[in-house]
Amino acid sequence: MNNLSYLEPDYSEFVEVDPTGRYGRYNEVLGKGASKTVYRAFDEYEGIEVAWNQVKLYDFLQSPEDLERLYCEIHLLKTLKHKNIMKFYTSWVDTANRNINFVTELFTSGTLRQYRLRHKRVNIRAMKHWCRQILRGLHYLHSHDPPVIHRDLKCDNIFVNGNQGEVKIGDLGLAAILRKSHAAHCVGTPEFMAPEVYEEAYNELVDIYSFGMCILEMVTFDYPYSECTHPAQIYKKVMSGKKPDALYKVKDPEVKCFIEKCLATVSLRVSARELLDDPFLRIDDGEFDLRSVDMEDSVGPLYRQPHHLPDYYNYPSNSSSLNRQYSNGNYPSNSSSLNRQYSNGYNSHHEYQNGWAYNPAETEETHGIELFESRNNDDQEEEKKSGNVDITIKGKRRDDGGLFLRLRIADKEGRVRNIYFPFDIETDTALSVATEMVAELDMDDHGVTKIANMIDGEISSLVPSWRPGPEFEECLAAAAAANAASICNNCVSNRTSMGSVMDFLRTNPGANVIQCCRNGCGETHGRFEEITIRETEVRLRELWKLQQQQESRELSSIDSGHNHSEEEEEEEVLYEDPENMFSCEAGNEINHISGSGSFSFMPSKYCDEPSEKTENQVQQELRWLKAKCQIELRDIQDEQLKTRWPESGEEVEISPKDGFLGSVSGLGREEDTVKEMFGERLVPKCLKRTTSLPVDAIDS
């Protein structure tokens, strides 16, 4: 049975031997790449088959000195001994033929990519087992001093002994011992190369990036950036921070999060040791993780592993018809030889439908977790969740050509979220901004697609040349910021790359679309500034502002000796209600009682008539707010009593007049009058912010 009859007569004789005479190479090619050819070879001392790897240097090296240096580096690699590193028996440089030859162990199941393609149905537990073995091998390489970096890690360079589930890192012939002079070379496969490799300044963490791409390849069966047709396109995407499209096919949140952790920027990327301690890879011996890793099939259904799978439904791990002694080479494709009698006494009756193994148990209720998105189910869920909220969006063009948008989300309970954010039409897409917004502001109840479509529609109205459409090239840009604590700075945000709401309001005083601080207290989340208010709080604040304006007009009339015009008395104040835009005239809204701090309501034709109970509550709250402002003003006034006049230098004592302490907003509006009386240093500019008291002050 086990004989060498499959070898042709020409392969029975050595065509080349190593300098020691121990290893002989046959003319049988097991695999071939761009610069390397793998032959079957034999170890005469041990009597085992090995793999003879031959690398053509061509113009890689320009002098004999370079060859000698490379020989010394590769020779050190045979000292690496680890159970998850391919055994490296010997290596030498053939200077005459400009070849590098190295002999390694032979594997029964080929590369991890070939093995994964043959076995499409793999439980996620098995994938975690492979990941742990690969990480142990990387940790061993990186623990050397100086570290050894692989520089070309991919599933084609990871090998499997399928009968034992053993995974080993191979193809170390192109690896280098990390030194300053040796690490500065751009080597590897473009799809698996980290951004810092293109910059030719990197360390051992480039292998972690490649490892993340290997997991993505194991899950999706595709090379990363398979959507690109040219290496230049891959380079552009990698350097701009765009992740491969295949990443967005992964639905399992744990798998996706683990991959993103490996693909993080070099400053945030973790080591192999830290990844081994990651909760994702922790599975106790008695624990069962029943999620299956399936490949998305465009022609057939996606079957999931049932919760209870009898032993006789499991495929054998090893089959002599499939696992022939091939390594590093081409493998026969799947055949119908699986449908035969196995040694365990059970018949396999699985039939193939569209390339998938069919199992009767899989037609029943399943409990697996799919790794790929089901767009129809997601859309239905989003529509169900978004039915309880009203989402609108408005935008405005800035002087520099940029856009500033406000997203307004109102629910049935009267809670309103106003989210202000900039939008760069050159670099941003509606989908990327919507995805970032949902992650930053924890907006799980609102669909990303719906928000993206609304952003597209508003931008199209502001920029006629805008071309809307979803693009899945962008991913979450601030994952670390999403976990950071949200700190409220009383609506004064930190400066972002696109500016802030406060900067926009200062530079655009006449903006009607953007209304912010008077309605609530804001929080900054990355580029987004959020102000959350309630409908009753909006009404309360507007009434308080109207009373302040009435008192300030009376004060100004007494201090300046002239009356305001009839137009100023009838000045309108606009504010936004959750349902409509209300216009309440100050003269009709407030009937001020001279000499008292109370007021009465006179409903206008645009405002709802409040009940007696609501009116009493509003009066009580306004009296509390007024008293608080008066206390603050008295404290500031006491500190300024001994301030000198700028011109004469004489000490001035300020005597507050009746009603002077009644309005914070009045001081802001009558700033010129106060300057004439007391000088610029007496103007309490900081008091302007009390017109936007925090929401918490009203509830206390």
Curated annotation (Swiss-Prot):
It catalyses: L-seryl-[protein] + ATP = O-phospho-L-seryl-[protein] + ADP + H(+); L-threonyl-[protein] + ATP = O-phospho-L-threonyl-[protein] + ADP + H(+). Induction: Expressed with a circadian rhythm showing a peak in the evening. The keyword ATP-binding applies. CDD domains: STKc_WNK. GO terms for biological process: circadian rhythm; protein phosphorylation. Residues 314-345, 551-575, 647-666 are annotated as: Disordered. ATP binds at T104, E105, L106, F107, K154. The active site is at D171 (proton acceptor). Autophosphorylated. Residues 566-575 have a biased composition (Acidic residues). Disruption phenotype: Plants display delayed flowering and altered expression of genes involved in the photoperiod flowering pathway, such as ELF4, TOC1, CO and FT. It holds the Pfam family Pkinase. InterPro entries: Kinase-like_dom_sf, Prot_kinase_dom, Ser/Thr_kinase_AS, WNK_Ser-Thr_kinase. One of its GO terms (molecular function) is protein kinase activity. It is an enzyme of class 2 (transferase). Gene3D superfamilies: Phosphorylase Kinase, domain 1 (3.30.200.20), Transferase(Phosphotransferase) domain 1 (1.10.510.10). Residues 314-339 have a biased composition (Low complexity). Residues 24-281 form the Protein kinase domain. Belongs to the protein kinase superfamily. Ser/Thr protein kinase family. WNK subfamily. This is Serine/threonine-protein kinase WNK1. It comes from Arabidopsis thaliana.
